[in-house]
C-alpha cells in the first residue's frame, strides 16, 4: 500500500485497495483508505474460505477484470496461508509482466517500470518490465505511514465495492487442493546403547537406521 501511495504522489493516478476474506477483513480496507487509498474492493463469501491459491487468484481476476489498472502491487505473503504466489498467479492469468521480492520501483514512462529485486546473499537485481505489471513487494521496502485524523474522517466518503460468489459467477467453485490433516509432529527422544562386536554393532545400527528411524 505504501509503495502504491508513493507512486501516486509522484505520478498521479488512483490507488484501489483490494482484499478477500471474512467480514472482519473489511477493516483492513478501511485502514487502507484512511491512509490514502482512493477506494476499495472487498471480496467475501463463505464459499471462498479454504480455497487453494490458484482458485483465489481466479476470484481476484473476476473482481478486477473491469478495472483499468497499470500496476497490481501485492505483499510478500498472506498472514493465513503464506503461499507467496498470488502476485505471480495474477500476472499469468491477466497476461502481465511480473517481478517478486521488489525492494524499489521506478516508473520509466507510460509503458515501462524498473524494479529492484532482492536476491540471495545481499545481491540485488534491476529489471525493466512492461506495463501493466504485477509486482510482489518485499517486506521492509518502506515504512508504512499512519492514518491521519483527516484521512480517517474521509473514509466514509470513499467507495467500497463488495463482491460475493454470485456477483463473480463463482457459486460452484470448489478447491483444487484438499487439506486432509494439519498437525504438529510429535517430538520424542530416545537413547539406546548397542553392544557387541564391531560387526554386530554395525549390523544392529544399520537395521535401526533402515527400519526404525523415520
Residue locations for each model-derived region?
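N-terminal glycine-rich FAD/FM-binding segment characteristic of electron-transfer flavoproteins
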Residues: 1-214
Amino acid at each position: 500500500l505504501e509503495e502504491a501511495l508513493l507512486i501516486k504522489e509522484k505520478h498521479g493516478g488512483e490507488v484501489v485497495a483490494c482484499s478477500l476474506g471474512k467480514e472482519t477483513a473489511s477493516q483492513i480496507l478501511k485502514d487502507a483508505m484512511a491512509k490514502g487509498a482512493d477506494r476499495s474492493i472487498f471480496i467475501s463469501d463463505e464459499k471462498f474460505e479454504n480455497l487453494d491459491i490458484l482458485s483465489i487468484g481466479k476470484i481476484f481476476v473476476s473482481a478486477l477484470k473491469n478495472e483499468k489498472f497499470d500496476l497490481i502491487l501485492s505483499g510478500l505473503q498472506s498472514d493465513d496461508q503464506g503461499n507467496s504466489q498470488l502476485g505471480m498467479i495474477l500476472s499469468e492469468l491477466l497476461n502481465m509482466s511480473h517481478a517478486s521480492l521488489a525492494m524499489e520501483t521506478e516508473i520509466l514512462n507510460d509503458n515501462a517500470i524498473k524494479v529492484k529485486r532482492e536476491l540471495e546473499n545481499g545481491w540485488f537485481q534491476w529489471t525493466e518490465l512492461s506495463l501493466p505489471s504485477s509486482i510482489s513487494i518485499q517486506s521492509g521496502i518502506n515504512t508504512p505511514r499512519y492514518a491521519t485524523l483527516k484521512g480517517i474522517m474521509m473514509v466514509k466518503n470513499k467507495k467500497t465495492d463488495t463482491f460475493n460468489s454470485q456477483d463473480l459467477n463463482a457459486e460452484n467453485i470448489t478447491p483444487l487442493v484438499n487439506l486432509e490433516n494439519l498437525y504438529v509432529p510429535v517430538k520424542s527422544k530416545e537413547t539406546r546403547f548397542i553392544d557387541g562386536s564391531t560387526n554386530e554393532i554395525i549390523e544392529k545400527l544399520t537395521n535401526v537406521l533402515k527400519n526404525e528411524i523415520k
